[in-house]
Regions:
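Active-site entrance/lid segments in N-terminal catalytic domains of soluble metabolic enzymes
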Residues: 1-177
């Protein structure tokens, strides 16, 4: 462990200062952005805000609502492959929905079996969120690298980390979003 003694800022230290604008109304502001990811080479177009993959947040209902904006949803990792397959099957007529959803997984063998099954059933899945409580473990970094090797076409969201150094390491190991 290393102790940093330099000053750190928190949200309470940040002031968003407005500046002059040519916009006639705040309704004219366009938050939609387009990103091409480094490793998967896929392009995302939407508002870059994600609903977390928590049980009460990363739900099918949340995904259906956020796509209207368009925002992104990381589904709760406890959804079973059959549930995801059924849900995707019922929404096949909404191709934009699939480009705004990530299927979530952990890094255990059981998690790997579940995500493998899900990706076999739902071949149109574009995003996977690899989520652990401590993104600073070598085991997590190694898992991201193995997942990238196995699924080069998937856009990988990986975390949780808070430092630029580990975000960079995740991207070098194969993640697209860290």
């Amino acid at each position: 462990m290393r102790i940093d003694t330099d000053v750190k800022l928190d949200y309470s230290d940040v002031l968003l200062r407005p500046k002059r604008s040519t916009m006639g109304s705040r309704k004219d502001v366009d938050l939609v952005r387009e990103y091409t990811f480094r490793n998967s080479q896929k392009t995302y177009r939407g508002i870059p805000i994600m609903a977390a993959n928590m049980g009460g947040v990363g739900t099918f209902n949340m995904a259906e609502e956020l796509i209207k904006v368009p925002m992104f949803t990381c589904l709760d990792k406890n959804y079973q492959p059959a549930d995801i397959w059924d849900w995707f099957g019922n929404h096949v007529h909404k191709p934009d929905l699939q480009s705004h959803i990530a299927i979530s997984t952990g890094i255990t063998e059981v998690d790997q079996e579940r995500i493998d099954t899900t990706l076999k059933l739902c071949r149109s899945i574009e995003y996977v969120c690899i989520d652990v409580a401590n993104g600073y473990s070598e085991r997590f970094l190694d898992y991201v690298a193995r997942f990238r090797e196995k699924y080069p076409h998937i856009t990988i969201i990986a975390g949780n980390v808070v430092t630029a150094e580990l975000t960079e390491e995740l991207i070098l190991r194969g993640a697209d979003i860290g």
